Amino acid sequence: MKRNRFIAFFLAFLAIAPAVARDVLPVTGSWINLFYQDERNKYSNPMDMDNTDPVMWRAKVREMKALGIEYIVFMATANDGKADYPSKLMPLAYDARRESPVSAIIDEAAREGMKVFMSIGWAENQDDNLRNPAILNRQLAIMEELAGLYGSSEAFYGWYLPVEDCLGPVLTDAAVVAVNKLVERAHKLTPGKKTLISPYGFFCCRFDDPNFAKQIMRLKVDIIAYQDEVGCVREEFPMPRLKNAWREMKKIHDRTNIEFWGNCELFSWEKGTNSRQSALVPAAMPRVLSQLAAATEGGVSRIISFMTPGIWSLNADRFPLGQPEVSERAAQEYLAWRNGDRTLKLLEKSLTGTLGSNTAAIASVAVKNGDATFLTDGITGDENPENAAWKRFEAGYNEITVNLGKADTGSIFMRLLNCAKRGIGVPYKVYIYTAGDDGNYSLAQIKEMAQHPNSLHDTWIEPLLIEWSTSVKSIKIGFQSTTPLLIDELYLR
């Protein structure tokens, strides 16, 4: 009887205990692009570099490993009728006296214990249309040739099928037929190997249409890694809609045997969006972190990305792929988060709703000419400046004063919205004044907030961490900015 009472108590406890959020998943897979196709590849595959150098690609594989990448996905193994592997179907895109880029990458991946998805594109180029029987048959021939060359490699994990069709509003019959035909051939050529697709169109999916789920369930593919389209900016503020899309797609995948992965885009645009005349450049780390948090909370089992090589860079001195300086900084900021950087970890917790605040220790919060209760009400905004949780501070100098109940050491974490396209930025200087029991303020520190260069199209939540190691009773935070500011919450730690 005692045992039964204990079980009943334990089950009751589980019913009332707060849910524990999953740890935000890191990026463990990435596409790798071998060819310069247009201006989008300006930094990832520079025209003035030898993009067929096997030494470079081996170095990039090791770099991917250092970033925590386990899965490498070839974007394409051929382009414009030339192959980056020892093909008998078409001419070579590299010097035949050297190791091919594809061979170098898959061999180095095997050495590093990584897994590779081989691409069967392009039959012609990045505009391959699988509704054309000649294109489909050519991709099948490429698959057969690649299976013979690399099917026995330790690193060969499966196939990436570049069937970049649109999910929405409902996946077409033609797309389903094309995918399933490729999957059938792949499983016949390489039994036990996985097949992967990564469709776009999350922003226009009709989840309320019963045919939408039916079409997904008809697919015979092993893995779908959905493009989150945040980098592509298919809508002005994609994050609020994206969170719901992940949840809805998870419900569908729970009724299938298809693995549910996320493809979180790491890039932004140097000029216009979705243009072949605009280079891909690194997105700000807070934007990327929000994408990872949304995909994790949406239930994906793994996050892969387009893409780390040429967007993030760890070997810029020898092989300078990526936007100068910015790609290096992006890689270091990502690794800082992986290694527990406090500011980014606090942002992560705030994004997942698991960041607590010691509001009981705050006696009062004040702002000039306004109500400051919003700063400690526990209500946070999303990546949309029209969300009512964001409170506006005009350009110039603004102050927030936090009075503690008693003198203590600690830290304050704040969230600001960065939305350059709406004229909302972050302060270029933050002044921290502290006071003890006597109420006399003195300047304790000045923080400079980095202004990310690739803010033309994106909106993200910018973290600000203020720490003090001496016992203080009041903190005054001054912001100097040339644009209006949006702030939603203040956390006392």
Protein language model annotation of sequence segments:
Residues 22-70, 75, 201:
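Boundary/entry segment of secreted carbohydrate-active catalytic domains
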Residues 54-123, 174-195, 239-242, 248:
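Aromatic-lined substrate-binding rim segments of carbohydrate-active enzymes
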Residues 97-112, 131-158, 215, 295:
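An active-site-proximal structural segment forming one wall of the substrate-binding cleft
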Residues 121-127, 143-173, 304:
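Active-site groove signature of glycoside hydrolases
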Residues 154-167, 200, 209-240:
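Aromatic- and acid-rich polysaccharide-binding/catalytic face
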Residues 228-235, 258-344:
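Substrate-binding cleft of secreted/luminal carbohydrate-active enzymes
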Residues 341-407, 417-426, 444-458, 489-491:
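Disordered, acidic Ser/Thr/Pro-rich linker "stalks" and the adjacent N-terminal cap
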Residues 477-484:
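Short beta-strand-plus-loop segments that form exposed binding edges in beta-rich domains
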